[in-house]
């Protein structure tokens, strides 16, 4: 691909240029990132070590937590460091890596949420065939397809970014590199690229969201014929999933279906989508799922007993 770039680095303006508020941003992002790592790593370790968390639902929860951790790590550490600097610059290649990694793990999370919805439907509505339909082999294949699909999606995004000529200026009014703010730095017409962006990212977000909400409406409607115990079990796992879907897809759809129009809240929405949801997801899942909470208690009980013996 022929590149026509005079820009070797970009200047990120971040959330604020005020030194006082930059310190506040540093503290908030650092706490959110540490909380994200702690919460998701607890889920990852619990699923891997607990025999009670070996069914397909927790297999997908494991990869959802891994995806949350990687998505946050691809963006948040850089924003934490930038909050301490007077002038924040990012090289062109690092910017492209950030675009690629954020879209890989963001898209992977979308696919995992879809797989989790399918898993919940089969578990509640077809319990006798659950282990046959959602077998370990099927879970592995579905996850491999999700990874491949995420990488293909991200390669398309990188192709779109690299097809644009950047001649300057190189100041990006954003917290991190993404296609929407990058489009504004291109020194050529970006209408076609913008349409491709919307048809790629926007369509994936919007269609997946509609499918998930529609599937849960059907799923919850089918529960009326089940016993109170089955309904309680379904709601205990599905409510948390629905909350995560709404929190994740709302900002995602907003960012990638607004045709490069900048609103004052754009940066805040992007931060919530990449940082906030990764922090909230483990909190929501552990608060609403008794099996995960029980496994975590046992894990920490064993740790405390081991420490006491020493």
UniProtKB/Swiss-Prot annotation:
Instruction: Please give the Gene3D superfamilies that the UniProt record associates with this protein.
Output: Rhodopsin 7-helix transmembrane proteins
Which GO terms fall under molecular function for this chain's record? G protein-coupled receptor activity; olfactory receptor activity
* Glycan-bearing residues: 6
**Which membrane topology term applies here?**
Multi-pass membrane protein
Do you know which InterPro entries this protein is assigned to? GPCR_Rhodpsn, GPCR_Rhodpsn_7TM, Olfact_rcpt, Olfactory_Receptors
Q: Which Pfam families match?
A: 7tm_4
Task: Supply the alphabetized keyword list.
Answer: Cell membrane, Disulfide bond, G-protein coupled receptor, Glycoprotein, Membrane, Olfaction, Receptor, Sensory transduction, Transducer, Transmembrane, Transmembrane helix
Where are the disulfide bridges? 95-187
Q: Per the UniProt record, which residue ranges are transmembrane?
A: 24-47, 56-77, 99-118, 138-156, 194-217, 234-256, 268-287
Taxonomic superkingdom: Eukaryota
Which regions of this chain are Cytoplasmic-facing, per the record's topological domains?
48-55, 119-137, 218-233, 288-310
What does this protein's UniProt record list under function?
Odorant receptor.
Q: Which family does it belong to?
A: Belongs to the G-protein coupled receptor 1 family.
Question: What protein does this entry describe?
Answer: Olfactory receptor 4C16
In the UniProt record, the gene name given for this protein reads OR4C16
């Amino acid at each position: 691909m022929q590149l026509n770039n005079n820009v070797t680095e970009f200047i990120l303006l971040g959330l604020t240029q005020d030194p006082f508020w930059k310190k506040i941003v540093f503290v908030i992002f650092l706490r959110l990132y540490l909380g994200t790592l702690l919460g998701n790593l607890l889920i990852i370790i619990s699923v891997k070590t607990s025999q009670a968390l070996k069914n397909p639902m927790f297999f997908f929860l494991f990869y959802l937590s891994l995806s949350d951790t990687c998505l946050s790590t691809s963006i948040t550490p850089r924003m934490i460091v930038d909050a301490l600097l007077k002038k924040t610059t990012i090289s062109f290649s690092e910017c492209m890596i950030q675009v690629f990694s954020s879209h890989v793990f963001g898209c992977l999370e979308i696919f995992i949420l879809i797989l989790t919805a399918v898993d919940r439907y089969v578990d509640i509505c077809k319990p006798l065939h659950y282990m046959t339909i959602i077998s370990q082999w099927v879970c592995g294949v579905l996850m491999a397809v999700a990874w491949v699909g995420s990488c293909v999606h991200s390669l398309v995004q990188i192709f779109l970014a690299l097809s644009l000529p950047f001649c300057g200026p190189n100041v990006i009014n954003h917290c991190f590199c993404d296609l929407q703010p990058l489009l504004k730095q291109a020194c050529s017409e970006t209408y076609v690229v913008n349409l491709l962006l919307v048809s790629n990212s926007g369509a994936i977000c919007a269609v997946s969201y509609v499918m998930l909400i529609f599937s849960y409406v059907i799923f919850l409607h089918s529960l009326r014929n089940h016993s109170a115990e089955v309904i309680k079990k379904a709601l205990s796992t599905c409510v948390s999933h629905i909350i995560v879907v709404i929190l994740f897809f709302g900002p995602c759809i907003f960012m990638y279906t607004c045709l490069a129009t900048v609103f004052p809240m754009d940066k805040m929405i992007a931060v919530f989508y990449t940082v906030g949801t990764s922090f909230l997801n483990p909190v929501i899942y552990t608060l609403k799922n008794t099996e995960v909470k029980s496994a975590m208690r046992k894990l920490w009980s064993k740790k405390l007993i081991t420490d006491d013996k020493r």
